[in-house]
């Protein structure tokens, strides 16, 4: 199908995403989106702890299974190892068909390419990809579509329910045992955690690390 700038969009892409082709800069002016309702978990017993010892235990407690969507942020840029650590454990557990919904992926995440090749990761939704991940996508190694959005477009997709995040991993520099997070006060201060705000609000489960006293 031909879009508003004359580009032919494959029908299989339209069918897979349920999207319309680009109809012009102002085609959605005054359009109303309905927000999805996030899942909220209650904690009434002050003696019950949400703490776990490691990534494996966190994944088990979050109910990891085939076909889930896992989200990450990129505030640590090329110093981020959260994606690699989590995906290594998911791979070791034998989980397949994972979609990664990240605010961005860079060269620091090159180690996850083998998981694309073996089917651990089958979909990527991000605001950008670089390095060997980009090469893997460009050469057809990713089974499903790679969907790129602006940072604001990613927020809209999550808030509207177009993307449902099952588990969000947020590598905040500091957090407490209640899950309150901030971007300073630790060993990897990174500034405002704005990219991960929508993940924290809408994901079914949220995992954080770098504990400090409440």
Where are these regions (language model features)?
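Conserved alpha/beta enzyme-core scaffold
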Residues: 1-214
């Amino acid at each position: 199908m031909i879009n508003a700038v004359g580009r032919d969009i494959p029908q299989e892409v339209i069918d897979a995403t349920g999207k319309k082709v680009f109809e012009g800069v102002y085609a959605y002016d005054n359009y109303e989106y309905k927000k999805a309702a996030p899942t909220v978990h209650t904690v009434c017993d002050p003696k019950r702890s949400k703490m776990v010892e490691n990534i494996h235990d966190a994944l088990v407690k979050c109910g990891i299974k085939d076909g889930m969507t896992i989200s990450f942020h990129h505030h640590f840029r090329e110093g981020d190892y959260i994606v690699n650590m989590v995906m290594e454990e998911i791979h070791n557990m034998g989980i397949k068909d994972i979609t990664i919904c990240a605010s961005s992926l860079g060269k620091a995440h090159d180690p996850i390419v083998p998981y694309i090749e073996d089917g651990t990761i089958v979909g990527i939704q991000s605001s950008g990809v670089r390095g060997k991940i980009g090469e893997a996508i460009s050469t057809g190694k990713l089974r499903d579509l790679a969907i790129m959005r602006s940072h604001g477009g990613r927020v809209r997709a999550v808030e509207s329910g177009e993307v449902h995040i099952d588990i969000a991993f947020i590598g905040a520099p500091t957090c407490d045992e209640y899950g309150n997070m901030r971007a300073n006060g630790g060993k990897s201060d990174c500034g405002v955690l704005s990219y991960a705000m929508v993940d924290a609000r809408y994901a079914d489960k949220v995992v954080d690390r770098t504990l400090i006293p409440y």
